[in-house]
């Protein structure tokens, strides 16, 4: 068994792992226990009553966090002509067409989010095996295949978080930094949870929201009382 460091052990002191914490209290505890020498990310995980192996139980979407994510997001855009110019003006880090396809095919992926105009998808489609496993493949369902590239770039830079359920029925995302104030973190958590709840698929049966937990990069995990996730 791996040895637990003194810092981690201290962070877990006083944590009741059987308790469901009100969200606001959980955020306060997480911030107090964050002792790393860097600005830790606040992570939320939601266990859902779905089986993503079935198409009618897939959960995915995008949410614009009201207070941003606190991280610098590099955005790549596949576009030509005026749309390429719009993407650059909006702050895209990488803009290209055939040249960008070649770059990605070589394994050079220096971006966190990928956007494409509809006319570029026949080209971008060739990159499915490269971008798909990394969760970077543009998709119209989450607004990353669009003619309004400027809005998509600004949303990505400003706090848009894409989510997709994993095989075990878990959806998770970074929703801020421990340097955020407590209200900002709580607002982001509630926005994320609301988006996941609204994305409930038609095939979901029984209890959809099974468990919610929150943690920081190096901190303890706390279970959240789901009834406290609604905006007050």
UniProtKB/Swiss-Prot annotation:
Extent of the signal sequence: none
One protein family per Pfam: Ribosomal_L1
Keywords: Repressor, Ribonucleoprotein, Ribosomal protein, RNA-binding, rRNA-binding, Translation regulation, tRNA-binding
Gene Ontology, cellular component aspect: cytosolic large ribosomal subunit
Taxonomy, superkingdom: Bacteria
Family under the similarity heading: Belongs to the universal ribosomal protein uL1 family.
Subunit structure: Part of the 50S ribosomal subunit.
UniProt cross-references to HAMAP family, sorted A to Z: Ribosomal_uL1_B (MF_01318_B)
Function: Binds directly to 23S rRNA. The L1 stalk is quite mobile in the ribosome, and is involved in E site tRNA release.
Protein name, per record: Large ribosomal subunit protein uL1
Source organism: Chelativorans sp. (strain BNC1)
Lineage: Bacteria, Pseudomonadati, Pseudomonadota, Alphaproteobacteria, Hyphomicrobiales
């Amino acid at each position: 068994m791996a040895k637990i460091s003194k810092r981690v052990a201290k962070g877990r002191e006083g944590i009741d792992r059987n308790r469901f914490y009100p969200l606001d209290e959980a955020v306060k505890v997480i911030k107090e226990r964050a002792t790393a020498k860097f600005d830790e990310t606040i992570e939320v995980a939601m266990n859902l009553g779905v089986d993503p192996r079935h198409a009618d139980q897939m959960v995915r979407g995008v949410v614009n966090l009201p207070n941003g994510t606190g991280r610098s997001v590099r955005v790549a855009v596949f576009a030509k002509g005026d749309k390429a110019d719009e993407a650059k003006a909006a702050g895209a880090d990488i803009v290209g067409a055939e040249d960008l396809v070649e770059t990605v095919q070589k394994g050079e992926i220096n971006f966190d989010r990928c956007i494409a105009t509809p006319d570029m998808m026949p080209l971008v489609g060739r990159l499915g095996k490269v971008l798909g496993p990394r969760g970077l493949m543009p998709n119209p369902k989450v607004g990353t295949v669009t003619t309004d590239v400027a809005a998509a770039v600004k949303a990505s830079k400003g706090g848009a978080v894409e989510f997709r359920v994993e095989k075990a029925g878990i959806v998770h995302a970074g929703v801020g930094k421990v340097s955020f104030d407590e209200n900002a973190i709580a607002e982001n958590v509630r926005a994320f949870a609301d988006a996941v709840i609204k994305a409930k698929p038609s095939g979901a049966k029984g209890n959809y929201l099974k468990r919610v937990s929150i943690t920081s990069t190096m901190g303890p995990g706390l279970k959240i009382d789901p009834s406290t996730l609604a905006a007050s």
